[in-house]
């Protein structure tokens, strides 16, 4: 997408439906972006970003951290949630009130009124980093939605179906966009195409993504 086309996108908040139970709340958190990023800095000072290793032994291109009662971790033993940060050997930082309120309100806006996350995965993308198509299925209660908040550089989000080979929608996510999916779309495959280099007044050379989940 060229900058000319980017400039032509609507600047007021608007809702885009991806599938039943899945929407993008465009610009929903844009006005809070700097404050949200300040929370991210505080969290990752206590629980630094790191590149996790997949069960197959590959280093993920996206740097990760967590906050909440549990955090998502990966190593050669598998994917799982842990109450202890394996890097610091301490509990993860609590989800800040501002982040919690944003996640709950966005879920309600998308039609999920009972969402109360206990985990927030923080992903940091640099130029070239990506997230391959995958399902979020490590949570015990799949009736709860996923809430995903974008900060910083724009990225192309892929949202597919229940099978990996299903055709994917491609959506440009910019700062403050919030994707919410649940219900019949809860296990849909999704991912992020390689990030293009750029500069954000909020996050510098990075894209930050906050993914809120109810794990238990």
Please report, for each region that a protein language model flagged, where it lies by residue.
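Non-heme Fe(II) oxygenase metal-center motifs and adjacent flexible, charged/small-residue loops
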Residues: 1-216
